[in-house]
Amino acid sequence: MAHELSKTILITKVTELIAEEYRISISQARDMLFDSEIINLIDNDETGLYGESPLYVFSLFQEKHKI
């Protein structure tokens, strides 16, 4: 449960980026993020993804989804 604040902030910012990019609601964007494998990478402290920028994580999300 380390780095929870960083993860919460990162998830919030990435969700906002998804909503803005795809012109969907925050709720829909959150669902998309939580249904993706990216959320597991953020949650895994060993990946260190929680310390990356929201734009970097968003780019990973886009790469995985090719929407």
Q: Which residues fall in each region the model found?
A:
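C-terminal alpha-helical interaction appendages
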Residues: M1-I67
